[in-house]
């Protein structure tokens, strides 16, 4: 593989384990949501996101109903921008009081640092809100890695399974699609990126995917089990 001009990476299942997100972050936000909404619901930023939830369900409803809706969305792993924003705010409090640190695979932390040192700009694209992404990297168990990242993208740029989202990102960072390498564990995301000409690599970590995906499903995406296998 030739050296890309930019690297775009997912987080969950790519730089970090799926289990940390599913077993630590999601339950934490679910437990904290009722108290957080009741305590901060009148804050303009929080109310903005709560209003988006109300608009989504199409009703003028009390906060208790919004809380129940948000908890249901967490259980369903709903990729709703308002949910992701509120989760990010809750996790921010958790990071600040050291309730947890964000999991980062050692190979990912080392390789991101090496690529940054080599002058390759790094970008993050995750369904989690941009503030949540920044907190994740700033409070990782490998230390503060947020300074390695040139820019961050979330679902406000579009769905991760739509090619148009990757076109927007390429335009934003000012690099030809063919010179961007996108790293993800989700084949549908890689398919969408590849349709724009972006290079792709599938992360298939044994911890997250004990049974390898079939060759037919993987298609033409390069398949690796760690960042250390990405050589250019």
From Swiss-Prot:
Gene3D superfamilies: 1.10.720.60, HAD superfamily/HAD-like
Pathway: Amino-acid biosynthesis; L-methionine biosynthesis via salvage pathway; L-methionine from S-methyl-5-thio-alpha-D-ribose 1-phosphate: step 3/6; Amino-acid biosynthesis; L-methionine biosynthesis via salvage pathway; L-methionine from S-methyl-5-thio-alpha-D-ribose 1-phosphate: step 4/6
EC number, UniProt record: 3.1.3.77
Entries under InterPro entries matching the protein: Enolase-ppase_E1, HAD-like_sf, HAD-SF_hydro_IA, HAD_sf
Cofactors: Mg(2+)
GO molecular function terms listed in the Swiss-Prot or TrEMBL record: 2,3-diketo-5-methylthiopentyl-1-phosphate enolase activity; 2-hydroxy-3-keto-5-methylthiopentenyl-1-phosphate phosphatase activity; acireductone synthase activity; magnesium ion binding
Matching SUPFAM superfamilies: HAD-like
GO annotation, biological process: L-methionine salvage from methylthioadenosine
Pfam families noted in UniProt: Hydrolase
Comment on bound cofactor: Binds 1 Mg(2+) ion per subunit.
Reactions the enzyme catalyzes: 5-methylsulfanyl-2,3-dioxopentyl phosphate + H2O = 1,2-dihydroxy-5-(methylsulfanyl)pent-1-en-3-one + phosphate
Record keywords: Amino-acid biosynthesis, Hydrolase, Magnesium, Metal-binding, Methionine biosynthesis
CDD domains: HAD_EP
Described function: Bifunctional enzyme that catalyzes the enolization of 2,3-diketo-5-methylthiopentyl-1-phosphate (DK-MTP-1-P) into the intermediate 2-hydroxy-3-keto-5-methylthiopentenyl-1-phosphate (HK-MTPenyl-1-P), which is then dephosphorylated to form the acireductone 1,2-dihydroxy-3-keto-5-methylthiopentene (DHK-MTPene).
Subunit-structure text: Monomer.
Family: Belongs to the HAD-like hydrolase superfamily. MasA/MtnC family.
Full protein name: Enolase-phosphatase E1
Organism: Xanthomonas oryzae pv. oryzae (strain KACC10331 / KXO85)
Gene that encodes the chain: mtnC
